[in-house]
Amino acid sequence: MNNKTIRKIFDLKNLSLGRNAWIWWFWLFFFKNPSNSQKPRQVAILWSAKNDANIKCNGIELGTKNPLKEDGSVHGGIAAWYFDGKKMHDNFLLSRVKINQIPLGLYTPYPDTKFQFKEDFFKITIKDKMKFKATLIKDKNKFITPWVKEHKYFGLGYDMTGINKLNLKATINGKKSNGTAYFQKVLLNAPAVPWYWGIFHFKHGAFLSYFNPHFLGKSLKKDVSFYDGKILHKFDNIKVKGTGNSLPTFHIKACNNEKTIDFLVKSYSKTTWNFRKKKFGFIPTTFDYRQYPAKITNFKFNNMKNGSTISEKDIGIGIGNAEHSTGILI
């Protein structure tokens, strides 16, 4: 990762948050479950700030008007959940915080959390209970290397920085484990609309992500990216069908002119961040951000041009996280 990208992740001095703009730093950690290898443990942590004094998450007020402060800090919120292998701890962290900047890093004093870059890895700590070391993977493929995306239209849109996979060493309550991690930083200057999203890491080195935001029945983006360990395959067409209620299965299909991909995303736990606010002080708006620790099964990839195929037997089961959000947050 070059120095420019690193500085972009942590830069608060040049940050501009217009009315209702939203910034967040989000980590997902996937690591071994000694009691059930088919259901890896997961932790998600989100540091965020939204220029909106009226927003609540799971009943807790997290919004702040003009969150950027003269001392370089940001007043916002922190949220985290933890699937311990058996049980989901929904509000593992959930409170208003002051986000302070340190060299190539951020920290909050209450609760005590830190996120900092050192040489070729990120160090993330949550109180004295959890420590994570997420190391960059040396690979020239653009799906693995850190990426930056920007999309703006008439001043509205988003600016993203992400890393689709890092190698992970985790220490939970003094016990060590290992796995993989995912990171994104997002500056959103537009309404939050419903979406399907997922990121998955496979046993034999493959990775997959999909993203399908939609509004009033119309898809705003259709994207599936699959890295088979050698080649990155892109699809700009996707169909998502969810079945089941509490722990759904998502059937996902995508295709392009030469290739098709088809797989199931089976969730094994669930948590939700429920965002609530009143527009103009009296019009209620809701946004339910559901997250599912999940695995990919029944994977099928077909290259119609050369006849090659890739199945679950070739790449193993994919472990990761699926999201399904509903509502709208203006």
PLM-predicted stretches and their roles:
Residues 1-330:
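Structured soluble/peripheral alpha/beta segments that form catalytic or ligand/cofactor-binding pockets
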